[in-house]
Amino acid sequence: MNKIIILLIILLSFDIISAAKKFGRKGIRTLGDNEVLLSDGAIRGTVTDTHRVFYGIPFARPPIDELRYEDPQPPKPWSYVRDGTKQRDQCIQDCKLGKGSCSEVGTSEDCLYLDVFIPRTVNPGSKVPVMVFIPGGAFTQGTGSCPLYDGLKFANSSVIVVNVNYRLGVLGFLCTGLLSGNFGFLDQVMALDWVQENIEVFGGDKNQVTIYGESAGAFSVAAHLSSEKSEGKFHRAILSSTPYTVGLKSQTVARGFAGRFSSKIGCDLEDIDCHRSKSPEEILAIQKELGLAIGDKILDAFTIWSPVVDGINVNEQPLTMIKQGTTHDVPTIIGDNQDEAILFVYMTYKNVVIPSSYRTMVHVLFGIANGNKVLEHYPLPGFLKDSRPILSKLLTDYLFRCPGRYHVSKSAQANESPIYHYQYKQVLSGGHSFEACEGLVCHGTELPMVFNTYESALDLDLEEEEEEFAEQLNNYFVNFIKYSNPSHPNGLPTPKVWNPTTKTTNTSLVMKLGFEVKDLITNDPKCDLFDSLSYNGYTKDQNRMRKSKK
């Protein structure tokens, strides 16, 4: 009897080895099943009639204790079947991003997990294109595990969606002489490594990976386009509402903010043990207190904490590399919303901004001579009238629209891969959670339409023509993810042909009901002015906080 048992064990071992060889180090346990075997262990997900989803897959070791303020480390293998039916905590933050944009399960330093949405019928040999979504939130808020970014719609269109988390704020970007300040960015790189290692288990094609980000997520995508660390780990890119002009932090600026933070929390800048002794609650409280000081660039207020240009992980400012033609040459979509800056201006200035204050802001931002040129295009309103509307238009152009146009123009000249541009102009019906955005197309307005989560995440009841618009919008993105062409003839139906901008054509797609195709580059004196001033090239006497004259 014992010999028979031993023989059965040996035969079973051969079967396991055979299966492992068939699928590499990993393989799906039963086709159509809810369990998969990853490189680090097995995980059980949820199966529905239309798709499968695996929540809370670890792509790095928890960055806690001695791993706080360290580059991400590979996860430890596990020997049990991990529960992937529930979302994990978002990274430490005080999320105020609005309905549907924050996690419903809490926060933790143990947050380096990703969620995978898969078409129901795929198997390990399907070679389905993959979209990795990097959420925004000024590098201090945001999570891939929220209702807004549910990947069901993409999965139903035969795209695998991977939503990632990464460390935020101080915990993600504290830069000292000893610390790079790029932990959050390297978390994203490790997530891309995980995709290369594991996505075939889910039926994905590791050679067809699109990275897609919005706002700070788009700036992250721009950094990946500029980083040797990310080369070859993605093959297409989508950047929505990229605040290029804000810039990533230089090491000098990043260390300045780190020094102030260290003083407030009671640690020497280089005393990492002291920093590791502080609770997440203490860190978050001091982080929220920290603002600009005399000598800081005004635009640093948008992202006090961000990836750092260190010459190793992030080689240079993305817009500088775009100008030089040295970014990774991959098919790209880039675009922005009609009223991007309204949200930021009205959240910062809750009361009327009088014209004299507006003029001072422009002069501080651009210097007096260049500021006067800017005021010719964005003139002062009437006496004592509110300047916030014109300030919003200026910042929409200067932070988002014009540098986006610059990116498209330079890449079309330097790269072989196609680049597509859009302008999103569809007002979100059913109201906006922020009063100043009512009837406008604010930052982030496109997201519930692209993901088709307007009902599930925002409880919006759209008109039939708006639902059709959202369907068509998603089709453009799906076609690009599959074919590098949003209007590919073999793709899903779209109402207009969206051609790339090239060395000789300047096409842009206006995203609103009916869609329109228009010229992007020419006849735009406002952007021409900002191009001539540059977006990151101000002297030390400009664009900085100053002491007010008595």
Swiss-Prot record:
Molecular function via GO: carboxylic ester hydrolase activity; hydrolase activity, acting on ester bonds
Cleaved signal peptide residues: 1-19
UniProt cross-references to PROSITE patterns, sorted A to Z: CARBOXYLESTERASE_B_1, CARBOXYLESTERASE_B_2
Main location: membrane
Active site: S215 (acyl-ester intermediate), E340 (charge relay system), H443 (charge relay system)
Compartments where found: Cytoplasmic vesicle, Esterosome membrane
Glycosylation sites: N156, N506
A GO cellular component annotation in the UniProt record: extracellular matrix
Disulfide links within the chain: C91-C111, C267-C274
Protein name: Crystal protein
UniProt gene name: cryS
